[in-house]
């Protein structure tokens, strides 16, 4: 794609946004203790939790990748979001209260509370490596590509360094509070900007184009695809996507850390429901524009360039600056979230175990230093991503091999009181070995089977190993089950207490509304 010049007004809007977002992040972000630095003091209300969760989830994969996939295959890519909302209701109902009540700082810490430290170190190590070399580096690389469209002569590494400094400037000094303060503004800008872009798409013939697709029954506006579909076969919607969704929404430190900052279980649950509602809206503000772009900009070779193309080609002066700010907001918000969550993993899962005498202030200092090292490594690695081709699809497929063993450990830990540390660690390691074998000899084992259909095989295998190996060792101690396992009695007690509150304060009502909306969307676009 050729470079596109923007005028002074748009440049000024972008610069003012960058200055404003740093100021917002630092204004209330001074933290001296671990609870404040890593979890914002656990004081966030539901609407802040929801906006922050949504902003952190809109990564380069979502904003650029999903619009690109929509351009290439149609609305079927929204199945990931649709399934994700169902998973969010499940997460808020069963897992979130255990996370918050147990007082954990990191998701791997939950595995130690429920099982043992081996499972914690294994999962935390995987998260740190993936966050640095895939997520953080990917966000930096995506941001650099967008700026290269505007300033083709600029050095890629220099652009990456600038974005790294931008995100680090408000995340490292203030921790999660700074990140969340910035994410609130970024979420609003992202939503408003995406609505503006959607309006521009519809104003340029998008509505008539979508109407013609619906009338003709075109496959591009169908969520449910044939089993042979290369994008999202219908069976994958049932057996594959929910597993990946649980990993993304319930086991992902970057996202769950926002929920852990909630001031109560109820506020956290409502925040998740709010984020779920915003996630459903991505059908209209991210996916539909990608489909419409097939009509407006046919023949683009790289689908991942669709979103930047729409922004640069459709919007006038002023609005272009706002939308570019929204695009940068998504990328910097993601980077900030990854940076803070990864430093939390290193500090609380590893350093705090090594230096057991470290006080709160020292943990914060270590967290800041870890953030600095992480962003430097990611910035150095980011330019190498261009050598790997379609990283987003590659990462999505890799997740289908990484996620099932981890999801199996969490599900068994929460819903089986007999599962123990030996079984969990065996399931994680055995799942990793089998996943590696499946990856290396996938064609010989599964032929041309879609990766979403491979997920249940790995999940069932990992569940079976955890169950079988757990039988070879004593049941876990009673203290291992406190605030780490689901209790039917507690669920019934909660049901009785919720019967006494107003319906609009009942998170289950809003969860039910989200599930109904998911069903309606699935029916309309079946």
For each feature predicted by the language model, list its residue ranges.
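Membrane-embedded helix-loop-helix hairpins and adjacent transmembrane boundary segments
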Residues: 1-526
């Amino acid at each position: 794609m050729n470079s596109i010049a923007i005028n002074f007004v748009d440049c000024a809007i972008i610069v003012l946004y960058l200055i404003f977002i740093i100021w917002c992040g630092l204004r209330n972000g001074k933290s001296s203790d671990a609870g404040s630095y890593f979890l914002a003091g656990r004081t966030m209300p539901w609407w802040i939790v929801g906006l922050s969760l949504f902003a952190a989830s809109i990564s380069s994969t979502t904003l650029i990748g999903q619009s690109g996939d929509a351009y290439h295959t149609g609305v079927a890519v929204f199945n990931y979001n649709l399934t994700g909302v169902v998973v969010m209701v499940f997460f808020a109902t069963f897992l979130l209260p255990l996370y918050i009540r147990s007082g954990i700082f990191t998701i791997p810490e939950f595995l130690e509370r429920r099982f043992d430290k081996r499972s914690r170190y294994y999962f935390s190590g995987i998260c740190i490596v993936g966050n640095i070399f895939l997520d953080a580096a990917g966000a930096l690389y995506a941001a650099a590509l967008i700026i290269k469209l505007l300033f083709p002569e600029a050095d890629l590494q220099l652009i990456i360094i600038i974005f790294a400094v931008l995100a680090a400037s408000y995340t490292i000094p203030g921790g999660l509070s700074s990140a969340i303060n910035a994410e609130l503004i970024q979420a609003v800008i992202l939503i408003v900007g995406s609505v503006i872009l959607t309006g521009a798409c519809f104003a340029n013939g998008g509505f008539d184009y979508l109407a013609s697709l619906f009338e003709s029954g075109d496959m591009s506006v169908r969520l449910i695809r044939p089993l042979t579909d290369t994008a999202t076969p219908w069976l994958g919607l049932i057996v594959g996507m929910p597993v990946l969704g649980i990993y993304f929404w319930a086991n992902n430190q970057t996202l769950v850390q926002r929920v852990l900052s909630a001031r109560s279980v109820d506020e956290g649950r409502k925040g998740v429901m709010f984020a779920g509602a915003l996630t459903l809206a991505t059908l209209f503000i991210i996916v539909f524009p990608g489909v419409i772009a097939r009509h407006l900009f046919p023949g683009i070779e790289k689908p991942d360039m669709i979103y930047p193309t729409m922004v640069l080609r459709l919007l006038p002066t002023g609005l272009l600056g706002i939308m570019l700010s929204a695009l940068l907001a998504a990328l910097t918000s993601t980077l900030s979230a990854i940076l803070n969550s990864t430093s939390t993993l290193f500090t609380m899962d590893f350093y705090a175990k090594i230096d057991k005498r470290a006080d709160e202030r020292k943990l914060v200092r270590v967290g800041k230093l870890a953030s600095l090292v992480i962003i430097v490594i990611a910035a150095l690695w980011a330019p190498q991503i261009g050598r790997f081709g379609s990283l987003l699809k590659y990462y999505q497929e890799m997740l289908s091999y990484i996620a099932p063993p981890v999801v199996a450990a969490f599900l068994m830990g929460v819903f089986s009181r007999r599962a123990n540390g030996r079984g969990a660690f065996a399931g994680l390691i055995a799942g990793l070995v089998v996943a590696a074998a499946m990856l290396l000899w996938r064609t010989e084992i599964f032929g041309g089977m879609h990766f979403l259909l491979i997920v249940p095989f790995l999940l069932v295998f990992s569940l079976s190993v955890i169950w079988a190996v757990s039988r070879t060792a004593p049941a876990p101690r009673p203290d291992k089950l406190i605030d780490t396992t689901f209790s039917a009695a507690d669920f019934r007690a909660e049901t009785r207490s919720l019967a006494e509150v107003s319906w609009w304060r009942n998170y289950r009502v809003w969860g039910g509304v989200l599930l109904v909306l998911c069903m309606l969307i699935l029916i309309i676009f079946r």
